[in-house]
Amino acid sequence: MSRWTKKRIDEAFTALVTEHGYEDVTAAMIMEKADVSKTTFYRYFRNKADVMDYHYRSLYDAAFENENCKTLEDLFTLLFRTTREHPEELSLFDTIGYDSYREFIYNYTYRRGKQIIETAWGRPLTEREDFNIAYFCGGGARILEEWACGRYSGMTPEEAGAAAAKIIHGRYQVPIIKK
């Protein structure tokens, strides 16, 4: 039941954000569209930002788990493609603060990047290596936002993914090892 209920809430969230923009969507609107009670909604999510996090974490996790995602270039290409294929993301970039979409993108890419590198190297990152990953992901989150908003529209996701991968120092160019 929980997977089905979360899926309904997620689908309602996506439809409402596409129609109204993120800022104008409320938890009450999501509950009404998903046809779930307040108790049910809050059993799974704290607020609409939590639904946003669930939605995009699921979306990006699915891209990452894709069998064609073997290199960082593949991963960057998938991120750019996924962002371009989901125009509802545009209004999410208007959010600010702790629960903002920008913060989600940074945190997600940082955690995922750190996991990829540590898995490939078979050890935890040093403080300097962690700094490098965090710095790259901060800039990468900003570029992903600009990409979603139409900047660099002359580039395909493949071209953008290749360009992003070329920026990375050679020692960080690792294969993606899935567990």
Where are these regions (language model features)?
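Short, residue-level hotspots on alpha-helical faces of the histone-fold
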Residues: 11, 54, 58, 107, ...
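Amphipathic alpha-helical packing segments from all-alpha helical-bundle domains
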Residues: 98-144
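Cytosolic nucleotide-binding catalytic cores of signal-transduction proteins
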Residues: 18-20, 33, 124-131, 149
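Amphipathic alpha-helical segments used for helix-helix packing
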Residues: 55, 78-117
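C-terminal peripheral helix-coil segments that are non-catalytic and often amphipathic
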Residues: 149-179
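An amphipathic alpha-helix adjacent to DNA-recognition modules
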Residues: 2-14, 18, 23-35, 42-69, ...
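Short, hydrophobic secondary-structure boundary micro-motifs
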Residues: 25-26, 91-95, 156
